[in-house]
Protein backbone atom coordinates (compact mmCIF):
# COMPACT_ATOMS: atom_id res chain seq x y z
CA UNK A 1 0.00 0.00 0.00
CA UNK A 2 1.26 3.46 -0.86
CA UNK A 3 0.24 6.72 0.76
CA UNK A 4 -0.20 10.00 -1.10
CA UNK A 5 2.81 12.36 -0.65
CA UNK A 6 4.84 9.63 1.11
CA UNK A 7 7.72 7.45 -0.01
CA UNK A 8 9.02 4.27 1.63
CA UNK A 9 12.17 4.39 3.69
CA UNK A 10 13.71 1.14 4.94
CA UNK A 11 15.95 1.22 8.03
CA UNK A 12 17.65 -1.51 10.02
CA UNK A 13 16.16 -2.48 13.36
CA UNK A 14 19.13 -1.22 15.37
CA UNK A 15 19.05 -4.06 17.89
CA UNK A 16 22.40 -5.81 18.20
CA UNK A 17 22.39 -9.10 16.30
CA UNK A 18 19.15 -8.32 14.47
CA UNK A 19 18.97 -8.22 10.68
CA UNK A 20 15.36 -7.05 10.54
CA UNK A 21 14.38 -3.97 8.59
CA UNK A 22 11.52 -1.60 9.36
CA UNK A 23 9.45 0.17 6.72
CA UNK A 24 9.06 3.85 7.56
CA UNK A 25 7.33 6.49 5.49
CA UNK A 26 8.97 9.78 4.55
CA UNK A 27 6.60 12.65 3.80
CA UNK A 28 7.41 15.14 1.07
CA UNK A 29 8.10 17.76 3.78
CA UNK A 30 10.83 15.56 5.30
CA UNK A 31 9.07 14.15 8.37
CA UNK A 32 9.54 10.41 8.89
CA UNK A 33 6.99 8.18 10.62
CA UNK A 34 5.76 4.65 10.97
CA UNK A 35 2.18 4.21 9.78
CA UNK A 36 0.05 1.26 10.85
CA UNK A 37 -3.58 0.70 9.89
CA UNK A 38 -4.10 -2.94 10.95
CA UNK A 39 -6.52 -3.50 8.05
CA UNK A 40 -9.15 -1.57 9.98
CA UNK A 41 -11.12 1.02 8.03
CA UNK A 42 -10.86 4.62 9.21
CA UNK A 43 -8.09 3.94 11.75
CA UNK A 44 -4.45 5.01 11.70
CA UNK A 45 -1.57 4.80 14.18
CA UNK A 46 1.37 7.09 13.44
CA UNK A 47 4.65 7.16 15.33
CA UNK A 48 6.96 9.97 14.25
CA UNK A 49 10.73 9.63 14.29
CA UNK A 50 11.28 12.79 16.32
CA UNK A 51 7.88 13.66 17.69
CA UNK A 52 4.51 12.45 18.83
CA UNK A 53 2.70 9.14 18.66
CA UNK A 54 -0.94 9.51 17.65
CA UNK A 55 -3.88 7.22 16.97
CA UNK A 56 -6.93 8.49 15.07
CA UNK A 57 -10.21 6.61 14.66
CA UNK A 58 -13.38 7.59 12.81
CA UNK A 59 -16.74 5.81 13.12
CA UNK A 60 -19.42 7.67 11.24
CA UNK A 61 -18.99 11.26 12.38
CA UNK A 62 -17.39 10.32 15.72
CA UNK A 63 -13.64 11.00 15.86
CA UNK A 64 -11.19 9.82 18.51
CA UNK A 65 -7.63 11.08 18.87
CA UNK A 66 -5.34 9.31 21.33
CA UNK A 67 -1.88 10.51 22.32
CA UNK A 68 0.55 9.06 24.85
CA UNK A 69 -1.06 10.98 27.70
CA UNK A 70 -4.31 12.38 26.30
CA UNK A 71 -7.53 11.19 24.68
CA UNK A 72 -10.06 13.38 22.86
CA UNK A 73 -13.38 12.41 21.34
CA UNK A 74 -15.89 14.48 19.39
CA UNK A 75 -18.98 13.83 17.33
CA UNK A 76 -18.58 16.20 14.39
CA UNK A 77 -22.03 15.25 13.05
CA UNK A 78 -23.60 18.00 15.15
CA UNK A 79 -21.57 20.68 13.34
CA UNK A 80 -23.30 22.34 10.34
CA UNK A 81 -20.26 21.80 8.07
CA UNK A 82 -20.50 18.02 8.46
CA UNK A 83 -23.51 17.87 6.14
CA UNK A 84 -22.10 20.44 3.73
CA UNK A 85 -19.31 20.57 1.19
CA UNK A 86 -16.61 21.43 3.75
CA UNK A 87 -16.51 18.15 5.67
CA UNK A 88 -12.77 17.54 5.08
CA UNK A 89 -11.96 21.10 6.11
CA UNK A 90 -13.92 20.60 9.35
CA UNK A 91 -11.95 17.42 10.13
CA UNK A 92 -8.65 19.15 9.35
CA UNK A 93 -9.54 22.13 11.57
CA UNK A 94 -10.55 19.90 14.48
CA UNK A 95 -7.36 17.80 14.24
CA UNK A 96 -5.28 21.00 14.11
CA UNK A 97 -7.14 22.30 17.18
CA UNK A 98 -6.38 19.15 19.18
CA UNK A 99 -2.77 18.60 18.06
CA UNK A 100 -1.48 22.15 17.48
CA UNK A 101 0.28 22.40 20.86
CA UNK A 102 1.83 18.92 20.66
CA UNK A 103 2.78 18.32 17.03
CA UNK A 104 5.17 20.15 14.76
CA UNK A 105 3.69 21.74 11.62
CA UNK A 106 5.34 19.14 9.36
CA UNK A 107 3.85 16.35 11.48
CA UNK A 108 0.40 17.93 11.18
CA UNK A 109 0.76 18.06 7.41
CA UNK A 110 1.66 14.36 7.29
CA UNK A 111 -1.29 13.48 9.56
CA UNK A 112 -3.66 15.49 7.35
CA UNK A 113 -2.44 13.68 4.23
CA UNK A 114 -3.12 10.26 5.75
CA UNK A 115 -6.47 11.09 7.37
CA UNK A 116 -7.95 13.12 4.52
CA UNK A 117 -6.82 10.71 1.79
CA UNK A 118 -7.23 7.30 3.47
CA UNK A 119 -10.36 7.78 5.59
CA UNK A 120 -13.86 7.59 4.10
CA UNK A 121 -14.85 11.17 4.90
Swiss-Prot record:
A Pfam family hit: Phage_T4_Gp30_7
Full protein name: Uncharacterized 14.1 kDa protein in Gp30-rIII intergenic region
